[in-house]
Amino acid sequence: MGEKMQGFQGWSIGIRFLTSCVSIASLILLLKSKQTVQVSVGLDYVTQQVKYSDTSAFVYLVFSDILVAVYCIVVLVGLIPAALGKSHPGKAGQWAIFIFDQVLAYVLLAAASSATEVAYLADKGMAKTSWEAVCPRFAHFCHTVMASISLSFVAVLLLALLAVVSASGLFGRFYRRPLFAVKMRHNTLI
């Protein structure tokens, strides 16, 4: 069982490291997403600028990416001694990791989904409400934001995988029951 637990710890450490890297990459792309253009209005030019902080959905995604990256790094640092065989998180610690993996997956999924809706409206517009598409003018901004959102969805998938790995570690270590441990009784009709 010790090798199996170290295997789970190894998988967990690797996936957590990858998740933190993906979240940080998404965060950097979103923080760098800014574009300024000059638009012709009559005989004059007007300067327009767009950045991530103009929309609350993108700000929510920034904070969610920060939260996921920090959480993964903190848990990663805490799991390194366990992977080396020096100490293992107790039942309460494993439950906390299991729950937070799921909660943060849902938080990041909500943030990435709301940012996707805003990016869709920026790309397509909405004729019924007279919202015009801004991506034709701010193409670089839109491409950068979409890359960031895509990385956030990758991080969501990695967090979901982490939830499975942490559940396997938790239930495999503390709630193991042998398969078919209870003998079934049956009556024969004679």
Curated annotation (Swiss-Prot):
It is found in: Cell membrane. Keywords: Cell membrane, Membrane, Transmembrane, Transmembrane helix. Residues 32-59, 116-144 are extracellular. The chain crosses the membrane at residues 11-31, 60-80, 95-115, 145-165. The keyword Zinc does not apply. PANTHER family: CASP-LIKE PROTEIN 4A4 (PTHR33573). Belongs to the Casparian strip membrane proteins (CASP) family. Homodimer and heterodimers. This is CASP-like protein 2U2. The lineage of its organism: Eukaryota, Viridiplantae, Streptophyta, Embryophyta, Tracheophyta.
